[in-house]
A protein has these predicted regions:
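Beta-rich carbohydrate-recognition and catalytic domains
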Residues: 1-107, 115-215, 224-284, 295-299, ...
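Catalytic core of Fe(II)/2-oxoglutarate
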Residues: 221
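C-terminal substrate/ligand-recognition segments
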Residues: 289, 293
Length: 341
């Protein structure tokens, strides 16, 4: 097994549960035995929390959570935890403001990602901007949340920032499309010097040839910087006679030019199998949005939305998952090119 290192700040109190005994099929990922960690009706007026992002904050953890209100409109709620497993939520949705400090709430907001770049925390979500589009905000204290200009035109979803600048610029993955529900579904990379003006758009990877990602794909958790490249957990979607199936996939992107895919796992890493993944408001969904990881031990905790109803937690080790992705890698010419045509 190759020795792979995380090039990230240490988080010694990463949530963890050892691999269960007995044979294991497929990828070296195992579910938390007490899943789901967030159930139904977690907050007054909120029916379901899912597709949410968490990260270390001080000596504890903080998160931004997709809360599906009882009226069916999604918003983003703030949560706090001492162990990143048991969460307390603020009853009011996050109060976004504009650059002048005046209230500036999106019509709706869902599927947030949370990424720290330098000394600022960024929230990226999907919202209505004359169609499905990317919304962004920043905070330094999780008290004031200032909206940033919309980075892209509609239609676009599943955006996530890289956790550091590359070649002096912010980098963001996203999935543009020609409608809100993505007749085409490839991941693209864009860069910006200031989070306002975005360009140098590059194709990263397209839907795969395997059944689990044959319809579309989309970015998931913020990429993890490693000695092998950027480790990306993403989602792949297949279509069945009973609707979509969302699975978790893995890829490794070039460290200096993330539009180049070095390795891409042919197999899914996690697919709906447990009751909380197969049964819910939208059945058969595993949707990754965040990881917490410890560089010294290689431990990775993966947070994912389950069946649009719950939050699940899974675990892996860096060297094992990288080896699995490399051993089972199948890349296409479109994956390995620089993505400029």
């Amino acid at each position: 097994m190759s020795e792979v290192k995380m090039l990230t700040a240490p988080v010694p109190n990463v949530p963890w549960q050892d691999r269960p005994a007995g044979p294991q099929n497929g990828a070296p990922i195992w579910r938390y035995s007490e899943n789901p960690i967030i159930g139904r009706n977690p907050v007054k007026g909120v029916a379901r929390i899912f597709n949410s992002a968490v990260m270390p904050y001080g000596d504890a953890f903080i998160g931004v959570f997709r809360g599906e209100q009882t009226n069916g409109i999604p918003y983003i709620y703030l949560g706090h935890s001492k162990d990143a497993i048991h969460w307390d939520f603020e009853e009011n949705k996050i109060p976004f403001v504009d650059e002048n400090g005046d209230p500036f709430m999106p019509i709706y907001a869902y599927d947030p990602r949370l990424v720290k770049v330098e000394d600022t925390y960024y929230i990226i979500w999907c919202q209505d901007f004359y169609g499905a589009a990317i919304g962004m905000a920043k905070t330094t204290d999780f008290k004031t949340f200032t909206r940033i200009e919309n980075p892209f035109l509609p239609f676009n979803r599943n955006a996530v920032l890289f956790p550091r600048k590359i070649n002096g610029n912010f980098m963001m993955l996203s999935r543009p499309s020609d409608s809100g529900h993505t007749p085409f579904g490839d991941i693209f990379l864009s860069e910006s010097p200031d989070l306002v003006y975005w360009g140098k758009h590059r194709h990263v990877m397209g839907k795969g040839s395997e059944w689990w990602e044959s319809l579309k794909i989309g970015g998931g958790a913020a990429p993890i910087e490693t000695s092998e490249g950027w480790l990306l957990f993403y989602h792949g979607v297949s279509g069945t006679c009973n609707g979509y199936v969302y699975s978790i996939g893995g890829a490794i992107l070039d460290i200096d030019n993330p539009s180049i895919v070095k390795y891409r796992c042919e197999n899914f890493l996690l697919t709906p199998e447990e009751w909380y993944e197969e049964r819910g408001f939208v059945p058969n969904v595993c949707f990754p949005c965040a990881t917490i990881h410890y560089s010294a031990s290689g431990k990775i905790a993966i947070y994912y939305g389950a069946a649009d109803s719950y939050v699940g937690l899974a675990f892996t080790k860096l060297d094992e998952i990288v080896d699995y992705i490399k051993t089972n890698s199948v890349v296409t010419p479109a994956d390995t090119e620089i993505g400029r045509r």
